[in-house]
């Protein structure tokens, strides 16, 4: 290796992830086995549309993911919601993806994916009564309150000095 030249490598990501849209769609469709118990399923066209919407949301929010993303986790978490029907399922999932990434940005990634999804689900099924509009407003307020007065997380240094 020539030490006079800088060494680096460039990873080019197409659409925000390493999986192609068809691969993402297959990953999404694999959730149908679980969601069928709740009368919910996605068609290949809907799964592909969700993969595309996810990529567009990643670009809009300036985020990058190196795997299939959060869609499968959202699907598994929300499939038992009493507010999801076959008629609103795909559209609701698309909006949940948008809200998920917006919440991640607003909370500066201080809440892990699983915890954020659990909070979103609790708010969606609880006080929001299945309303995505309320989730967009109240959900963020609830998350910010949970993360501390500034909405940016607990200040561990301050907590130590209060002893």
Residue locations for each model-derived region?
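Long, low-complexity, intrinsically disordered segments
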Residues: 161-163
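Short terminal alpha-helical segments
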Residues: 2-56
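Acidic, low-complexity, intrinsically disordered interaction modules
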Residues: 42-159
């Amino acid at each position: 290796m020539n030490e006079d030249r800088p060494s680096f490598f460039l990873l080019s990501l197409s659409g925000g992830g390493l999986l192609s849209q068809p691969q993402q769609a297959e990953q999404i469709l694999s959730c149908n086995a679980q969601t069928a118990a709740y009368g919910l399923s996605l068609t290949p066209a809907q799964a592909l549309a969700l993969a595309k919407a996810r990529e567009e949301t990643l670009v809009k929010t300036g985020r990058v993911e190196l795997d299939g993303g959060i869609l499968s986790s959202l699907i598994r978490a929300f499939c038992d919601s009493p507010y999801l029907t076959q008629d609103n399922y795909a559209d609701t999932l698309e909006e949940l993806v948008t809200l998920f990434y917006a919440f991640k940005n607003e909370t500066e990634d201080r809440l892990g994916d699983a915890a954020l999804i659990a909070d979103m689900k609790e708010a969606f099924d609880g006080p929001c009564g299945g309303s995505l509009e309320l989730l967009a407003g109240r959900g963020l307020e609830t998350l910010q309150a949970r993360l501390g007065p500034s909405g940016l997380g607990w200040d561990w240094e301050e907590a130590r000095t209060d002893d």
